[in-house]
Amino acid sequence: MAAQTLYDKLWESHVVRTDPDGTSLLYIDRHLVHEVTSPQAFEGLKLAGRKPWRVHSIVATADHNTPTDNWDLGIAGIKDPVSRLQVETLDANVRETGALAYFPFMDRNQGIVHVVGPEQGATLPGMTVVCGDSHTSTHGAFAALAHGIGTSEVEHVMATQCLTAKKSKAMLVRVEGELQAGVTAKDIALAVIGRIGTAGGTGYAIEFAGSAIRGLSMEGRMTLCNMAIEAGARSGLVAVDQVTLDYVKGRPFAPTAEQWEAAVACWRELKSDEGAVFDAVVELDATTIAPQVTWGTSPEMVVAITDRVPDPAAEADPVKREGMQRALAYMGLTAGTPMAEIAVDKVFVGSCTNSRIEDLREAAAVVRGRRKADSVRLAMVVPGSGNVKAEAEAEGLDKIFVAAGFEWREPGCSMCLAMNADRLEPGERCASTSNRNFEGRQGQGGRTHLVSPAMAAAAAIAGHFVDIRKGY
C-alpha cells in the first residue's frame, strides 16, 4: 500500500461509498450540538416524522447566547428574547430526543462546545466530528477529522449519521525549532495565516507537524487547529503521540481497561506514513516567530509586535491595497505606527481559541502582582467551561485576576462574537484572544486585535500592546 497521510487514513476509514463524481458519503462518529444552529434541524426532523438516528453520537451544550454574569437570575438573565428562546429550545429538544451528554445553561459542565467536547473525552482520536460551527476544526488536535457544517447538514447528520463531502487536498505545515519564551501556539497560528493568507488553505486539510508542534500541549494544539479555518482550510490535524494519550486517558467518555488498550493500539497509527506525499508543504522556523498582533480586519492582516502598521502604498496589488486602506480606516490606524504604541480600551481573554486552563495560567502569570491600566475600561476573563473555571479557582487564578482589576466571568462564548451581552461599543479597541477580527465581529464598530492570552494580559496592564518577551 502506498504511504498515506493522516488525512488519507481518517477519510478512508469513514467512507461509506464514493460516487463517480468524487462525492463521498462519510460516516460521522460524533455530533456536537449547540443552541444556535440546532433548532431548525430538530424542527426539520419533527416535520418529517424522524428522530435522531444515533442519539448517543450527540453531545450538546449552550454556549453562544449564554450570559457570563448575572447567573443568579437564571434563564431570565438572558435579556435578548431570541437568544433566550434558542437556549430554551435546545433544552426542550435534547430532553425530548436524548443525547450521549447534555450540559444545559448553568450546569457545572456547561461551556463552549469546543472546550467541553475534548475535556469530557467525547472527542477521541480517529473520529469524524462535526458541529454547526466553523471552529469545529479545533478537534483535529486529537487526530480527529473535524469540520463545521451548516444547519441543513446538522439535520442531515441527525437523520442519517452520514454526510456527503468531497475529499480535500492535504497540506503539511511543518514548524521546526524551539519557540522563544512568551511565544505560543496562537502566535504560530497567526504567523501561518500571515504567511499563506486566509485563502491559502482553501480546499485543504492542514496537518501541523514538526518539533515545535510536538512540543505543544493539547491546549496549544487545539488553539492551532481552531485557527486552521482562518487560513481557509476545511480541517486542521495533529498526529497522535503520548501527549494526546495522556490528555484523553481517564476522561468521562474515554474508553477504559481493555477497551483503552485496544484503542491506543489503533490510535498510535494515526500519523502520516514516512514518505507520504502532500499536495502542498509550508515550512516555518519556530525560533523566528515573534508575538503576533493583527492590525486589520482579517486574521491575515498580522505582524510581529516589533513591527509597524503596514503602509498600503507599498502594496503592488491594487485589490489588496484597497483592502488595506479600508481596514486602516475601519480600525482608526495610521500606516507606520509602531504596534507597541497602539492603545486598547478593552481586553478579552476567552473564546474557543484561548479559554482553557493553560491559557488562563499564561494570562495570570503576566498580571500577578500588577494592576490593570486606568485607561483600560474593561479587562475580562471568561473560562471556556465550568470545569475550567473550577480548576482555575482551585489554583487561585480568579483571585489573581480580580486583584489586578479584571472581571472574572462565568463560561460561554462571550465577546468572541456580538451574539450575547458581552460586546464592544462603536470605536472601542480590544486586545482579544479570539479567532476573528472582522468588521463588527465583537460589536458594531468595534475594533479587534487578535493576540495570545499573555499578550492580551500584558496589554491590559500597560494600556497598549507590548512585547511579552520584555519584562513580562
UniProtKB/Swiss-Prot annotation:
SUPFAM superfamilies in the record: Aconitase iron-sulfur domain
Listed pathway(s): Amino-acid biosynthesis; L-leucine biosynthesis; L-leucine from 3-methyl-2-oxobutanoate: step 2/4
Positions that bind [4Fe-4S] cluster: C352, C413, C416
Cofactor: [4Fe-4S] cluster
Note on how the cofactor is bound: Binds 1 [4Fe-4S] cluster per subunit.
GO biological process, alphabetically ordered: L-leucine biosynthetic process
Regions annotated as coiled coil: none
Chemical reaction(s) catalysed: (2R,3S)-3-isopropylmalate = (2S)-2-isopropylmalate
One Gene Ontology molecular-function label: metal ion binding
Signal peptide: none
Main EC class the enzyme belongs to: lyase
EC number: 4.2.1.33
Keywords, alphabetical: 4Fe-4S, Amino-acid biosynthesis, Branched-chain amino acid biosynthesis, Iron, Iron-sulfur, Leucine biosynthesis, Lyase, Metal-binding
Subunit structure: Heterodimer of LeuC and LeuD.
Function: Catalyzes the isomerization between 2-isopropylmalate and 3-isopropylmalate, via the formation of 2-isopropylmaleate.
The family this protein is said to belong to: Belongs to the aconitase/IPM isomerase family. LeuC type 1 subfamily.
Protein name (Swiss-Prot/TrEMBL): 3-isopropylmalate dehydratase large subunit
Gene name of the record: leuC
